[in-house]
């Protein structure tokens, strides 16, 4: 759970998230071509702990979406949010919410990081 993972990895190596978002948005374009209209992807940025992290990553997602929109001449609808899975994210949720269109709660990870235990350990 700790270290160079989640959104921090995406900030250091944006090409990873650019590739994933490009694939999501091209799949959405294909769905629209097939007249499947009810799909709105929810792109969840992992392991966010600060407002800056989600802002950087959301800006990346929006930039990639615009690139795909321009290339395919297709309007894309999507949401960007995060999972509250770190104690700091829970404490800073008000700030993080300025950039998140949805939240999910990672109760297993949140419990593990709050108590400093591994999931392999039985209490």
Cite the ranges covered by each PLM segment.
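Conserved alpha/beta-domain cores
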Residues: 1-121
